[in-house]
């Protein structure tokens, strides 16, 4: 199981949003590159980077900063935010990003999402963000009217390489993960699942680890918890390694 430390970029700073709301942000660092290096030093095996400016504007905003992050760490980077065409996808892959996270267009433009999966096999994943069980789009602003199980068969057929499932109700709230919902999804999904939203303490790591052993759960993303100290990334990675050695 992989714990993905998150670096969310807004206005050139590393921030966290509460339940994805642009007006409810906490700035954790004025230097996202230093933060990326820090999480690698703490034992991170992957880095989860989101261009929040891009997510809200629909176009890449922090491309040069992201290129610098990729060049500054030796661990792979997965990136989301504002990637809504193949040209942008290619540019980020050329900049050193290992794999890309597609959100809105996976739901609103299935043909384009399928084309991206075909063009960059194994490197395109999807982020599905749910509130009250319903998928949201465009930076969690619009309700798609769909559930995750409405779209899962198509995403599987199109070749999505991984699936990030965010529980908006719990994101940034440090209220713990929804183990039941994640377990069901990891069992039903042929696509590796990554949990996001609510990962707050070692107890969440303990709760998710058995799911990763018995079902298709690849890991979990954590942000606010590792910045504020309720979860120690190095401790979490040591614990996981001790179970899988």
Swiss-Prot record:
Keyword NADP: no
Principal localisation: cytoplasm
InterPro entries attached to this UniProt entry: Aldolase_TIM (IPR013785), His_biosynth (IPR006062), HisA_bact_arch (IPR006063), Isoase_HisA-like (IPR044524), Isoase_HisA-like_bact (IPR023016), RibuloseP-bd_barrel (IPR011060)
Active-site residue numbers: 8 (proton acceptor), 129 (proton donor)
UniProt EC number: 5.3.1.16
Sequence similarity: Belongs to the HisA/HisF family.
Gene designation: hisA
Pfam families per the UniProt record, alphabetical: His_biosynth
Keywords per UniProt: Amino-acid biosynthesis, Cytoplasm, Histidine biosynthesis, Isomerase
UniProt superkingdom: Bacteria
Pathway: Amino-acid biosynthesis; L-histidine biosynthesis; L-histidine from 5-phospho-alpha-D-ribose 1-diphosphate: step 4/9
GO annotation, biological process: L-histidine biosynthetic process; L-tryptophan biosynthetic process
Reaction catalysis annotation: 1-(5-phospho-beta-D-ribosyl)-5-[(5-phospho-beta-D-ribosylamino)methylideneamino]imidazole-4-carboxamide = 5-[(5-phospho-1-deoxy-D-ribulos-1-ylimino)methylamino]-1-(5-phospho-beta-D-ribosyl)imidazole-4-carboxamide
Protein name: 1-(5-phosphoribosyl)-5-[(5-phosphoribosylamino)methylideneamino] imidazole-4-carboxamide isomerase
Organism: Oleidesulfovibrio alaskensis (strain ATCC BAA-1058 / DSM 17464 / G20) (Desulfovibrio alaskensis)
UniProt key word Amino-acid biosynthesis: yes
PANTHER family, alphabetized: 1-(5-PHOSPHORIBOSYL)-5-[(5-PHOSPHORIBOSYLAMINO)METHYLIDENEAMINO] IMIDAZOLE-4-CARBOXAMIDE ISOMERASE
């Amino acid at each position: 199981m992989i714990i993905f430390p998150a670096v969310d970029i807004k206005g050139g700073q590393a921030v966290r949003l509460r339940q994805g709301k642009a007006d409810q942000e906490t700035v954790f660092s004025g230097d996202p590159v230093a933060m990326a290096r820090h999480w690698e030093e703490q034992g991170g095996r992957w880095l989860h980077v989101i261009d929040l400016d891009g997510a809200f504007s629909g176009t890449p905003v922090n491309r040069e900063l992201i290129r610098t992050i990729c060049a500054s760490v030796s661990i792979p980077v997965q990136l989301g935010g504002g990637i809504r065409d193949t040209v942008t996808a290619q540019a980020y892959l050329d900049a050193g990003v290992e794999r890309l996270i597609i959100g809105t267009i996976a739901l609103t433009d299935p043909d384009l999402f399928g084309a991206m999966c075909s063009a960059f096999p194994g490197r395109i994943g999807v982020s599905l963000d749910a509130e009250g069980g319903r998928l949201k789009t465009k930076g969690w602003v619009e309700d798609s009217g769909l559930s995750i199980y409405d779209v899962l068969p198509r995403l599987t057929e199109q070749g999505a390489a991984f699936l990030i499932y965010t529980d908006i109700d719990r994101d940034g709230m440090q209220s713990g993960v929804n183990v039941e919902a994640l377990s069901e999804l990891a069992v039903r999904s042929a696509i590796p699942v990554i949990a996001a939203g609510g990962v707050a303490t070692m107890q969440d790591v303990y709760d998710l680890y058995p799911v990763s052993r018995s079902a298709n759960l690849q890991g979990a993303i954590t942000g606010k918890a590792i910045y504020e100290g309720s979860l120690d990334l190095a401790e979490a990675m040591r614990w996981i390694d001790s179970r899988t050695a």
